Amino acid sequence: MNKVVVKNVTFGEGAPKICVPMVGKTVAALKEEAEMLKTIDLDVVEWRVDFYEDVKDLAKVETALDEIRVVLPETPILFTFRSAKEGGELAVSDEFYFELNETLARTGKIDLVDVELFNEEADVLRLIETAHKHDVKVVMSNHDFDKTPAKEEIVSRLTRMEALGADLPKIAVMPKSATDVLTLLDATNTVSEKADQPIITMSMAGTGVISRLAGEVFGSAMTFGAAKKASAPGQIDVNELRHVLDLLHKQF
């Protein structure tokens, strides 16, 4: 399996890396969040820009990013606009979604960009090309807040992401039972054994918490923890998350 190196973080080896979302609505709130995150043992910060009140002003988005970078100069930043159709805060046009992500990728000030799989393939490929040209890694994602698809479908989506050029394919699904969690873990194990790229998977809500902890066993390279406000159901406090991941890593 290929390793994906972003600043001082290597995906695809050791314990799953911890990513913590920033969900501030204003620059002041984002700076405050960044100052807090600076004191926490994490690997990646995800800026959930769909929470930012001036997201439709690209110049203000870049200025906000600059302010975050002042506080977190060496921390890998994952730039994510989560669309409303995949559980995000704001509905925007496809045109704006791609313009925003391409513009920020071109700045070279982000390390990773989230690209949702279920878009026009030509747009997705263009964004991947732009990101890679500016040394930005691509987390390609899909979120199902209603259900857990069949194992074959989860495998198919992750495999498709890799085929399109994702550096880190990612899927998050909602379990209705413990069996659904096992389906996600089984699919993760199957894909990670044959994939060229590290993958990121999770089963959401309380039922799925085990999937956020067991990535090193089943083959998920990153997990999401909460420092202030969870951006998805089931996220665990980052300090507790680190403790459990370290415990499992020592035994593995």
Curated annotation (Swiss-Prot):
The active site is at H143, K170. Gene3D superfamilies: Aldolase class I. The keyword Phosphoprotein does not apply. The keyword ATP-binding does not apply. Pathway: Metabolic intermediate biosynthesis; chorismate biosynthesis; chorismate from D-erythrose 4-phosphate and phosphoenolpyruvate: step 3/7. Its EC number is 4.2.1.10. 3-dehydroquinate binds at E46, W47, R48, R82, R212, S231, Q235. Transmembrane segments: none annotated. InterPro entries: 3-dehydroquinate_DH_AS (IPR018508), Aldolase_TIM (IPR013785), DHquinase_I (IPR001381), Type-I_3-dehydroquinase (IPR050146). Coiled coil: none annotated. It comes from the Bacteria. Pfam families: DHquinase_I. Keywords: Amino-acid biosynthesis, Aromatic amino acid biosynthesis, Lyase, Schiff base. It is an enzyme of class 4 (lyase). GO terms for biological process: 3,4-dihydroxybenzoate biosynthetic process; amino acid biosynthetic process; aromatic amino acid family biosynthetic process; chorismate biosynthetic process. SUPFAM superfamilies: Aldolase. HAMAP family: AroD. Involved in the third step of the chorismate pathway, which leads to the biosynthesis of aromatic amino acids. Catalyzes the cis-dehydration of 3-dehydroquinate (DHQ) and introduces the first double bond of the aromatic ring to yield 3-dehydroshikimate. Belongs to the type-I 3-dehydroquinase family. This is 3-dehydroquinate dehydratase. It comes from Listeria welshimeri serovar 6b (strain ATCC 35897 / DSM 20650 / CCUG 15529 / CIP 8149 / NCTC 11857 / SLCC 5334 / V8). The gene is aroD.
